[in-house]
Amino acid sequence: GLIQTLPQTVNGEGSIVVQNPHATAIFGKLIVQFAESSEPMAIRYFYIPAKQSLELFRTPSGRFQIQILTLDKPIAYVSPIFTVPLYSTNRVIQKADWAFPHAPETVF
């Protein structure tokens, strides 16, 4: 049978760019699930001023979700889940204009 590959849980070669299109600053967290059998966990927290971008370097492999909170009127938004493959050197760009608002206390 196939032997499960261990995830790259330390610094990878790829990066994730988070673009903030909002007219307000955002606070956010980068959540990763390294493997099907592991619990998702926050590995980075960040702050991005209005209309700015931030590049998170040396991201590991796994399934990711970005969760943000707008800071003028607190509303939470979450990205679709996306995957960074093992040994990826790619830059993933995520524009934080996701459609479905969440109550802040359910996300943060």
Model-derived regions, located:
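Primarily secretory-pathway and cell-envelope proteins
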Residues: G1-F46, Q67-F108
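Short, solvent-exposed loop/turn segments in extracellular or other extracytoplasmic domains
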Residues: Y47-S53
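Alpha-helical interaction segments
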Residues: S53-E55, S88
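Short Pro-Gly-centered beta-turn/loop motif in secreted/extracellular proteins
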Residues: E55-R63
